[in-house]
């Protein structure tokens, strides 16, 4: 049974010396406005499994296989892509993550 981690508010957290988001097959982090890193809404799913990563990419992208020789909608799926602006906003906050976590702990 694969483990899916709900790591919504766990950016930077550790358990028994390992970072949260590294235990399961998938880990979901939230970017909603009250979280450690925010883009207003949305989230990030992390995995180190190439097959799952491909399935996730297709799922959040209406199952449209961009870059495939014959792109098609492979299965019914929504559009959950972050915008490029949301991605840039999230990336700009990463260097400040340790400070944000420390401030929340105080």
What are these regions (language model features)?
Residues 1:
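A short helix->loop->beta-strand "cap" motif at the edges of active sites that frequently abuts
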Residues 6:
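Glycine-centered flexible beta-alpha turn that most often forms the glycine-rich phosphate-binding loop
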Residues 10-16, 23-106:
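Active-site region of PLP-dependent enzymes
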